[in-house]
């Protein structure tokens, strides 16, 4: 167990190395961070940190740099996440508030996260299995054709044109719309199949076949597909860190092209109020083992809808990045809840 002074030395080493990308020496630490101890004492502390695997000496004439273990302890000992400035929070709110639909929200979120953190931003679309039906609309296009529109509470819109087996009057269309909304509006998408299992059986014979066709279209519109969408932005930011990856950024870029990998990376963030940090994990895609991932779920009323985060080198400004991810996740959840 490290004492508080050694933790302070480790924090200073991480902060300086993240800022300068240069090995950190004891004299520079004392001067820059006002540690109130001699360089010799700091050297002893650095030797202890090195013995325990928190820092390493890249070559004999150099200072020290943090290891994966050192970054991990640094993050775990952050007592609070550094808050964003009032101006930054207003900019986030203003930028996201201009979104016109779910696709625009996701697109803006990716761009915003990449700009705020100067890392690669990854945003998952809200998954249907975490969504609820907000409203259903039936629009009569002709006597034998209707347009079905289903809107979820996450802003997702699904449309289907339905060819009916027979004529359906305007009054019957309105009645079916009202009854369907009464049955499933406000209900979770995963519960809809059970809720509509006997819906058509309760309809008058004259519109039972139309009801069956419409229910089938509703179920098709709300089927939970596992090809969940993930959007990536800011990949060019990796070019800022040419020395932070063992060989090149190419393996990282290749990993970022695999949706399954990204969903797995973000999937562990399940609570909107929580920020998770993965550093050089071994159980991920090989191309991401030299990276760090900062992620959080977004949602409303404590219910997670999906996740977002950033991918970058282990030499990352963790306090600022964690604050940005937390703030953006909070605003995205709020906007989806309001709209």
Curated annotation (Swiss-Prot):
GO annotation, biological process: negative regulation of DNA-templated transcription
Pfam families: HrcA
Domain of life: Bacteria
Gene Ontology MF annotations: DNA binding
Keywords in alphabetical order: Repressor, Stress response, Transcription, Transcription regulation
Signal peptide (from-to): none
Stated role: Negative regulator of class I heat shock genes (grpE-dnaK-dnaJ and groELS operons). Prevents heat-shock induction of these operons.
Protein known as: Heat-inducible transcription repressor HrcA
Organism expressing this protein natively: Acidothermus cellulolyticus (strain ATCC 43068 / DSM 8971 / 11B)
Upper taxonomic lineage: Bacteria, Bacillati, Actinomycetota, Actinomycetes, Acidothermales
Name of the coding gene: hrcA
């Amino acid at each position: 167990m490290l004492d508080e002074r050694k933790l302070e030395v480790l924090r200073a080493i991480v902060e300086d190395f993240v800022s300068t990308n240069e090995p950190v020496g004891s004299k520079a630490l004392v001067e820059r961070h006002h540690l109130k101890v001699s360089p010799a004492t700091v050297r002893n502390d650095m030797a202890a940190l090195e013995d325990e695997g928190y820092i390493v000496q890249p070559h004999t004439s150099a200072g020290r740099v943090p290891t994966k273990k050192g970054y991990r302890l640094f993050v775990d000992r952050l007592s609070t996440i550094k808050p964003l400035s009032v101006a930054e929070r207003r900019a986030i709110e203003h930028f996201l508030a201009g979104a016109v639909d779910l696709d625009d929200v996701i697109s803006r979120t990716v761009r915003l996260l990449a700009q705020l953190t100067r890392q690669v931003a990854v945003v998952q679309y809200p998954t249907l299995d975490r969504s609820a039906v907000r409203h259903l609309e039936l629009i009569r296009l002709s006597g034998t054709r209707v347009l079905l529109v289903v809107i979820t509470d996450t802003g997702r819109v699904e449309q289907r044109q339905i060819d009916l087996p027979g004529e359906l009057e305007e009054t019957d269309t309105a009645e079916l719309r009202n009854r369907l909304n009464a049955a499933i509006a406000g209900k979770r998408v995963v519960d809809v199949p059970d809720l509509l299992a006997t819906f058509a059986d309760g309809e008058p014979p004259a519109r039972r076949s139309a009801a069956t066709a419409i229910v089938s279209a509703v179920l098709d519109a709300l089927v939970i597909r596992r090809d969940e969408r993930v959007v990536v932005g800011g990949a060019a930011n990796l070019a800022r860190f040419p020395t932070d990856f063992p060989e090149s950024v190419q393996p990282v870029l290749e990993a970022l092209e695999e949706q399954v990998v990204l969903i797995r990376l973000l999937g562990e963030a399940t609570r909107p109020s929580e920020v998770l940090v993965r550093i050089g994990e071994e159980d991920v895609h090989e191309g991401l083992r030299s990276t760090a991932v900062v992620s959080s779920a977004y949602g409303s009323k404590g219910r997670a809808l999906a996740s977002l985060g950033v991918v970058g080198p282990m030499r990352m400004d963790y306090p600022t990045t964690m604050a940005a991810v937390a703030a953006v996740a909070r605003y995205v959840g709020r906007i989806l809840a309001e709209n």
